Amino acid sequence: MQGSVTEFLKPRLVDIEQVSSTHAKVTLEPLERGFGHTLGNALRRILLSSMPGCAVTEVEIDGVLHEYSTKEGVQEDILEILLNLKGLAVRVQGKDEVILTLNKSGIGPVTAADITHDGDVEIVKPQHVICHLTDENASISMRIKVQRGRGYVPASTRIHSEEDERPIGRLLVDACYSPVERIAYNVEAARVEQRTDLDKLVIEMETNGTIDPEEAIRRAATILAEQLEAFVDLRDVRQPEVKEEKPEFDPILLRPVDDLELTVRSANCLKAEAIHYIGDLVQRTEVELLKTPNLGKKSLTEIKDVLASRGLSLGMRLENWPPASIADE
């Protein structure tokens, strides 16, 4: 049945060609003209930059203080060892960070299979070479930190933030969290009945083995869909600004005059005049206070100095004083 000319075609055929356990081709068709590049480019960017995964971030090698050194009995220099560790493919279940250990001695290659780990960790490519020992008496021991993350985080961005707490000998590694190693897409012509102007999207990708290519495509599509949800309904969902209700009086005015820590003589004179709060006091003038029995110029000067230190003065006018909270007492 012929659909409306305003309706968009939806892809109805998805073919997955599993070239190997880490290499697959995904075909999606038919797509309206132009949508092949639109979807292909979006998925490619997400697969390269936004897929979560696990990567080596720090390494401690016994007897090594910095990455620009060598280790006796080891064919590779430390920089090359770090580069090999960067390519380690690790799958971690239920944790964001794990510590792996490696201890090896004697002539021969040191591979990922020599790494000791618990049941939550899986080394996907145990044959991955880390270095070579060239002497029967040679040995190498290291602690490897693996963390969960997203995208690519170079070591240089973490150096300054961790410099104060990072001990000497702990080497930082560029963290490549993305499990997708290579991705490319191609848009070919597709046909539905009499229409020949349609697109067919072919995505070819390789992973490091920690994620199935089909699952990677599914996750990327989910991320894209979640990001686009906000555009489906463009109603203004911003919450109205809640204006903070300003207090009617400065809190200091509601405090008792005892908080001013006046001398006993001055404090007793104020209480005799029913001046219990700082708000009561600042409304009095100098003339009014001098009329208070036993309160002389020395006490008046003390009161003025104490008020001035708090940004207050005598003779202030306070509208609606006293507040209900005080008037009810």
Swiss-Prot record:
Record keywords: Acetylation, ADP-ribosylation, DNA-directed RNA polymerase, Nucleotidyltransferase, Transcription, Transferase
Region of interest (Alpha N-terminal domain (alpha-NTD)), ranges: 1-235
BP-aspect Gene Ontology terms: bacterial-type flagellum assembly; bacterial-type flagellum-dependent cell motility; cell motility; cellular response to cell envelope stress; DNA-templated transcription initiation; intracellular iron ion homeostasis; nitrate assimilation; regulation of DNA-templated transcription elongation
Keyword Cell membrane: no
Region described as Required for interaction with Crp at class II promoters: 162-165
Region annotation (Alpha C-terminal domain (alpha-CTD)) ranges: 249-329
Example of a GO cellular component annotation carried by this entry: transcription elongation factor complex
Positions where ADP-ribosylarginine occurs in the chain: R265
EC number annotated for this UniProt entry: 2.7.7.6
Function: DNA-dependent RNA polymerase (RNAP) catalyzes the transcription of DNA into RNA using the four ribonucleoside triphosphates as substrates. This subunit plays an important role in subunit assembly since its dimerization is the first step in the sequential assembly of subunits to form the holoenzyme.
Oligomeric form and interacting partners: Homodimer. The RNAP catalytic core consists of 2 alpha, 1 beta, 1 beta' and 1 omega subunit. When a sigma factor is associated with the core the holoenzyme is formed, which can initiate transcription. Both the N- and C-terminus interact with different regions of transcriptional regulator CRP. The rRNA transcription and antitermination complex (rrnTAC) consists of RNAP, NusA, NusB, NusE (rpsJ), NusG, SubB, ribosomal protein S4, DNA and precursor rRNA; S4 is more flexible than other subunits.
Name of the protein in question: DNA-directed RNA polymerase subunit alpha
Organism taxonomic ancestry: Bacteria, Pseudomonadati, Pseudomonadota, Gammaproteobacteria, Enterobacterales
